[in-house]
Amino acid sequence: MVVLVDTVSSTPVRPRHPEKAARPDSLSPKKPDWIRVRAPTTRGYGETRSIVKENGLVTVCEEAGCPNIGECWDKKHATFMIMGDTCTRACAFCNVKTGLPGALDPNEPAYVAEATRKLGLEHLVITSVDRDDLADGGAAHFAATIRAVREHCPTTTIEILTPDFLRKDGALDVVVAAKPDVFNHNLETVPSRYLSVRPGARYFHSIRLLQRVKELDPTIFTKSGIMVGLGEERHEVLQVMDDLRSAEVDFLTIGQYLQPTRKHHAVMRYVTPDEFGGYGKTAYAKGFLMVSASPMTRSSHHAGDDFAKLRAARAALSR
């Protein structure tokens, strides 16, 4: 690994992940042939990037280093990350900056709505950093953003990917009352890997969060996802499926974990496309309305197309 040292600037640059700086490098196996992405060089990519920057917005596509950014931005699809670019947690898999976030921007909901209009989005995905520093975890800001998009882009369907609102009483009720079309909260990994991968979260709290969404509003689609390749066993993935179905979750995503830097959790193995296919078939057999399972699957990848399929699957059940 090459380390670049700034010998010109007098202002010290804060590490993106200060809590990981002292860790030894974690080496991952070489990527197999099926892990391939297109370089982001198209005209559509450039136009999307311009709209994002003009509105002063943050995207999880950039901050998390999503491998699908070239494909999605070429189609003018972007996932907006609200409440800043700095997270209060330090998950071992995540490339988003860690630290003390700044104050919320009260104009951000309007900026998201305006960017949605300019991009012509039929389906919008909104996510956020964890904001454990806020009394409501950012729930009111989520709700305000949903309402702003509804007002300015009434035909756009809205999917949210939320933090867990751990120890934030009443926060979930505020978000659900804003009536997103899809409520996504990712489990990220199997329970046995939480201490090493997602130490600030609680597995069964996340399951209960998803279950509670259905109790508050059964019309909202619920969605969750996990990464594989973090050291989990197959039977553990199947148990996660059962736990999610017990919470009546509609949509499951499963994708390959890719290491952002050598300071992050190592890739323990690359799951083969055939194994992903097997997970997909099993998940459908367990009753999920929609499943996306492949090496390059990510929560927001093809979200608009998947939402159309999700609605069609629910409609077919009610006939």
UniProtKB/Swiss-Prot annotation:
Record Pfam families: Radical_SAM (PF04055)
Location of this chain's protein in the cell: Cytoplasm
UniProt keyword terms in alphabetical order: 4Fe-4S, Cytoplasm, Iron, Iron-sulfur, Metal-binding, S-adenosyl-L-methionine, Transferase
Positions of [4Fe-4S] cluster 2 binding: 87, 91, 94
Region of interest called Disordered, as start-end residue ranges on this chain: 1-32
Associated pathway: Protein modification; protein lipoylation via endogenous pathway; protein N(6)-(lipoyl)lysine from octanoyl-[acyl-carrier-protein]: step 2/2
Cofactor note: Binds 2 [4Fe-4S] clusters per subunit. One cluster is coordinated with 3 cysteines and an exchangeable S-adenosyl-L-methionine.
Residue sites binding [4Fe-4S] cluster 1 per the record: 61, 66, 72, 300
Position of the signal peptide: none
EC number: 2.8.1.8
Catalytic activities: [[Fe-S] cluster scaffold protein carrying a second [4Fe-4S](2+) cluster] + N(6)-octanoyl-L-lysyl-[protein] + 2 oxidized [2Fe-2S]-[ferredoxin] + 2 S-adenosyl-L-methionine + 4 H(+) = [[Fe-S] cluster scaffold protein] + N(6)-[(R)-dihydrolipoyl]-L-lysyl-[protein] + 4 Fe(3+) + 2 hydrogen sulfide + 2 5'-deoxyadenosine + 2 L-methionine + 2 reduced [2Fe-2S]-[ferredoxin]
Keyword flag Membrane: no
GO CC terms: cytoplasm
SUPFAM superfamilies, alphabetized: Radical SAM enzymes (SSF102114)
Annotated Radical SAM core domain residues: 73-289
Principal localisation: cytoplasm
PROSITE patterns referenced in this protein's UniProt entry, alphabetically: RADICAL_SAM
An example Gene Ontology molecular-function term: lipoate synthase activity
Family to which the UniProt record says this protein belongs: Belongs to the radical SAM superfamily. Lipoyl synthase family.
PANTHER family (UniProt xref): LIPOYL SYNTHASE, LIPOYL SYNTHASE, MITOCHONDRIAL
Name of the protein: Lipoyl synthase
Organism name: Rhodopseudomonas palustris (strain BisB5)
Taxonomic classification: Bacteria, Pseudomonadati, Pseudomonadota, Alphaproteobacteria, Hyphomicrobiales
Gene: lipA
